[in-house]
From Swiss-Prot:
UniProt: substrate binding residues: 40-41, 62, 154
Record protein name field: Acetylglutamate kinase
Catalytic activity: N-acetyl-L-glutamate + ATP = N-acetyl-L-glutamyl 5-phosphate + ADP
Pathways involved: Amino-acid biosynthesis; L-arginine biosynthesis; N(2)-acetyl-L-ornithine from L-glutamate: step 2/4
Main location per the UniProt record: cytoplasm
Keywords: Amino-acid biosynthesis, Arginine biosynthesis, ATP-binding, Cytoplasm, Kinase, Nucleotide-binding, Transferase
MF terms (GO), sorted A to Z: acetylglutamate kinase activity; ATP binding
Superkingdom per UniProt: Bacteria
Name of the top EC class for this enzyme: transferase
Protein EC: 2.7.2.8
Family note: Belongs to the acetylglutamate kinase family. ArgB subfamily.
Organism in which the protein naturally occurs: Staphylococcus saprophyticus subsp. saprophyticus (strain ATCC 15305 / DSM 20229 / NCIMB 8711 / NCTC 7292 / S-41)
Protein function: Catalyzes the ATP-dependent phosphorylation of N-acetyl-L-glutamate.
Gene Ontology annotations of biological process type: arginine biosynthetic process via ornithine; L-arginine biosynthetic process
Lineage, broadest ranks: Bacteria, Bacillati, Bacillota, Bacilli, Bacillales
């Protein structure tokens, strides 16, 4: 099957351009099989603040205590995921909400105890994806469960998207709140591993963009076709990425 993994960042969900859902529907009509992964950071932040729960970050990852995990799962599974699924279904696009627990879509391996209940997805169940995408567009929340402890784990949505894309040998579109990787205040149309290494050394790629582009290269090395970072609030962003019409940053080896 010809898969395309589309990751929609939490900060992008409220500003997603109205044409994006239609673009995704068009992929299905072109015998392509989109898979949507979403985050929900701003919604989680708001819920934690409302409930008076401190939220700490370590190495760009949310330190996830039991209390933080409970709220995170409520927001991602109970609010963000069904809202996105409903938005698509309202446009007559057959979609189905999932997380790692459903149909044993994937297992979780804990990252490091300093992050609390933060894990990495493993054992992606491609048979489930193959079956579902024949009729539906999966919309996957970045929550999973440890096989042995049965405890829920928070997963970075980028990490989940990369893992699924490399498992399926698919391209990945990262729809973000930025137009791409900025170098000298301009979007860099194409980057490869050597470019990325040099720009990091020159501190032109910095902060949270460093792990994003490094993880992109790693995903490509393990099977992902390519990674494109683009702004989710751009009109027809998905179609423009697919047809190579000059949007965002394309990362290749």
């Amino acid at each position: 099957m010809n898969y395309i993994v589309i990751k929609i960042g939490g900060s992008t969900l409220t500003e997603l351009h109205e044409t994006t859902i239609d673009d995704i529907a068009q992929l299905k009509q072109q015998d392509l099989h989109p898979i949507i992964i979403h985050g929900g950071g701003p919604f989680i932040n708001q819920a934690l603040e409302q409930q008076g729960v401190d939220s700490l970050f370590e190495d760009g990852l949310r330190v996830t205590t039991d209390e933080v995990m409970s709220i995170t799962s409520q927001i991602l599974i109970g609010k963000v995921n069904p809202q996105l699924v409903s938005k698509m279904n309202d446009e007559n696009i057959q979609s189905i909400g999932l997380n790692g627990i459903d149909a044993k879509l994937f297992d979780v391996e804990p990252l490091n105890e300093k992050y609390g209940y933060v894990g990495e997805p493993i054992n992606i169940n491609t048979a489930v994806i193959d079956h579902l995408t024949e009729e539906y567009i999966p919309v996957i929340a970045s929550i999973g469960r440890h096989k042995t402890s049965r405890h829920l784990y928070n997963i970075n949505a980028d990490t989940l998207a990369y893992k699924i894309a490399q498992t399926l040998n698919a391209p990945i579109y990262l729809l973000s709140d930025i137009p791409g990787v900025m170098i000298d205040n301009k979007v860099k149309a194409t980057l490869n591993s050597e470019h990325i290494k040099n720009y990091i050394e020159q501190e032109q790629i910095y902060g949270g963009m460093i792990p994003k582009v490094q993880d992109a290269i790693s995903a490509i090395e393990y099977g992902c076709q390519k990674v494109v970072i683009a702004a989710g609030n751009e009109a027809h962003v998905v179609e423009r990425i697919r047809t190579g019409k000059g949007i965002g940053t394309t990362i290749v080896l």
